[in-house]
Amino acid sequence: MVEKIDFVVAWVDGNDLVWREKKAQYDGSINTFKEGMNSEKSYREWGTFKYWFRGVEKFAPWVNKIYLVTDQQKPSWLDINSEKLVLVDHTEIICNDYLPVFSANPIESNIHRIPGLSEHFVFFNDDMYLTAPVEPIDFFSEDGLPKYVTALAPITTERYGTGHFQMNDMGIITSHFSKKEILNNGHFFSFKHGIKQLIKTLLYGTTKFICGFWESHLPYPLLKSTMDLVWEKEKAVLETTSASRFRSPSDTNVWLFKYWQIASGQYAIGNPKLGGLFSLDNAGPDFWKLLNSGKYQIMCINDGHNVQDEEQVMTDFVKAMDQLLPDKSSFEI
């Protein structure tokens, strides 16, 4: 049984004028192709981050430490004296030569450098909310392996999407593991992943090459030692990502470390019903009811790029979260 599990979450306040001025000094380095990958929506702050902390305190009180990774920022409501909270600045984990960075990819690639971080930790994006009780066994097996639901699936090729990063991640994986090794190690042909994922694997397992891994967009249980290992084997690539001030098609991302666990067989199969990915593009009365229903323990609520009435959606989002998590957490002033 894993004794200590930490949570790590990265956050940026895109409304902060000091941060915006700093970013503006480097915006000229963004070429036309990269503009779509680094739009204002990538940094938008909806004012819902306090509910992330409320969810953790209510639904995962067993967590050891929470490491909040920021760029010299902190939410105005945050109690920095909270016993479980540790603020981590980018300067503590990323080489000064590469700073400042305005992309999640360099940050995610260096989170294992957080001073004091436990071997077993779960990395969250700030749009991944706990919405019902979770236990350590939801993230790690009794013998300490990270738990994932996966499948063989093609990589989605959107011009400004994450497919570029996933292609780079998988290129590294397939350079270290053969198709035979991946299929033998990966536990893909198991009903435990869920019937939908098994069907994907059966469809794409017959191709000549590994086409990609299905991505759940849920929090990432990771091992610090695995990140060290991948850095040891792919230092040049990861240094390039670390030096990428803005999102670039040449980047890798945090999925690389998860994929390494899968390809090497160093993972256990998770619960396919643990959570889901949702977009605010489709937010309406039914979605807000779902958020409060307890059907999912974890919900990744993505900002989306086609929200029609942003002000109304933001109001409804905050209202729904306040219904689910009305009480202040110990992390709030």
Swiss-Prot record:
UniProt KW Protein biosynthesis keyword: no
Classification via InterPro entries: Stealth, Stealth_CR1, Stealth_CR2, Stealth_CR3
Respond yes or no to whether keyword Transmembrane helix is given for this record. Answer: no
- Give the domain of life: Bacteria
Q: Keywords assigned by UniProt? A: Exopolysaccharide synthesis, Transferase
Listed GO molecular functions?
Answer: transferase activity, transferring phosphorus-containing groups
Enzyme Commission designation:
2.7.-.-
Q: Name one GO biological process term.
A: polysaccharide biosynthetic process
Misc. remarks from the entry = The cell wall polysaccharides of some oral streptococci act as receptors for the lectin-like surface adhesins on other members of the oral biofilm community, especially type 2 fimbriated strains of Actinomyces naeslundii, allowing colonization of the human tooth surface. Recognition of these receptor polysaccharides (RPS) depends on the presence of a host-like motif, either GalNAc beta 1-3Gal (Gn) or Gal beta 1-3GalNAc (G), within the oligosaccharide repeating units of different RPS structural types.
- Family statement drawn from the similarity comment of this UniProt entry: Belongs to the stealth family.
Function of the protein? Part of the type 2Gn receptor polysaccharide (RPS) biosynthesis locus. Essential for cell surface RPS production, and for synthesis of the host-like GalNAc beta 1-3Gal (Gn) motif of the RPS. Probably encodes a 1-3Gal alpha transferase.
Protein name from the UniProt record: Receptor polysaccharide phosphotransferase WefC
Native source organism of the sequence: Streptococcus gordonii
